[in-house]
Regions:
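Histidine-acidic metal/acid-base catalytic patches
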Residues: 27-35, 45-59, 113, 169-188, ...
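Catalytic-core regions built around general acid/base machinery
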Residues: 76-83, 139-147, 248
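Positively charged n-region of N-terminal signal peptides that target proteins for export
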Residues: 1-9
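Active-site beta-loop-alpha junctions enriched in small/polar residues
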Residues: 39-41, 67-69, 93-96, 122-124, ...
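N-terminal pre-domain/capping segments
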Residues: 2, 25-116, 285-286
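Bacterial N-terminal signal peptides
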Residues: 10-22
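Active-site acidic/histidine proton-transfer and metal-coordination neighborhood
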Residues: 62-63, 70, 95-185, 271
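Secondary-structure boundary/capping motif
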Residues: 84-90, 118, 146-148, 180-181, ...
Length: 286
């Protein structure tokens, strides 16, 4: 009888160990709900701001990065967000406005409740040279300091052309090296890092907390890279169906301390691709 009890206990312990192992394996890799970049629904926002916010809220998303006020004042947009229990954590502006309307940009960001002010495109950047990178870094430092003094964090969003080779690295490395970490942070757009040949996970490991924000995107299979900073919008595909190694990127992002993740899908297929992307993120496990 004792031997039989020992055998039963052994089976119970073995079963429990398998169950525990299954639970550990089922731990979600990406537990939070991501935010949304307004550009994903740019056409809808042009027609109906309140209705588009309702549509995004219905997906379970409450964190927004706005790249446009869509005809609203910052106060009006903040009211619409508050009514829906939503927030704007990052406010995207043009580089021209950042340079020439810095105080207005800062005021709008504060009204919106945003902590971050983001720029995603540099005008007159062709060709992207060492001299241009150094000039841009100096401007970033100056503007970043002004925003920092107003309680905001400036972030630059890479767009591909910065990864032109230079020395043992790229001109993106020059931007990192020549900017002050206390005044200039970065938003990693993983598609626009991958397309010119960089490895997003390795960038996160290398620069860590310099990356405060991330755009979650995937690139259609078969698309070849370049340094143009441009690709057809149809090349944005649902996460997990393209070229990028999302699990490796998300693990590296967690280690780096990325604070906000935003879905950005520039394609005309957001009605199907955004839900597919959300389902993919939920399916990931460690």
């Amino acid at each position: 009888m004792k031997r039989k009890n020992r055998i039963i206990k052994s089976f119970i312990l073995l079963a429990a160990s398998f169950s525990f192992g299954s639970l550990v394996q089922a731990e979600p890799l990406f537990a939070q709900v991501p935010g949304m970049v307004s550009y994903t629904f740019r056409e809808e926002f042009k027609r109906d701001v309140p209705g588009t916010l309702d549509k995004i809220r219905a997906l379970g998303i409450t964190d927004m990065e706005f790249s446009n006020l869509f005809g609203q004042t910052a106060t009006e947009l903040r009211r619409l967000l508050d009514e829906r229990g939503m927030v704007c954590s990052s406010f995207g502006v043009s580089y021209d406005d950042l340079l020439n309307k810095t105080d207005e940009v800062a005021k709008n960001a504060v009204v919106l409740g945003a902590k971050f002010v983001r720029v995603a495109w540099l005008p007159d950047r062709q060709p992207f040279t060492l001299a241009f990178a150094e000039k841009t870094a100096a401007e970033f430092n100056r503007i970043g300091k002004r925003l920092h003094e107003q309680g905001l964090i400036f972030c630059y969003h890479n767009h591909g052309y910065e990864f032109v080779p230079h020395g043992a690295g790229t001109l993106f490395d020059v931007l990192m090296a020549e900017t002050n970490p206390q005044d200039v942070s970065f938003e990693l757009d993983i598609l626009w890092a991958h397309l010119p040949g960089a490895n997003p996970a390795q960038l996160l490991e290398k620069y860590g907390s310099r990356f405060k924000l991330m755009h979650l995107k995937d690139l259609r299979l078969g698309v070849k890279g370049d340094f143009s900073g441009k690709t057809a919008v149809e090349n944005d595909v649902a996460l997990g169906t393209g070229q990028l190694d999302l699990p490796a990127i998300l693990k590296a992002a967690k280690r780096a301390g990325v604070q906000h993740y935003y879905i950005e899908d520039e394609s005309p297929n957001t009605a199907t691709q955004v839900p597919q992307t959300l389902a993919y993120l939920k399916s990931l496990t460690n």
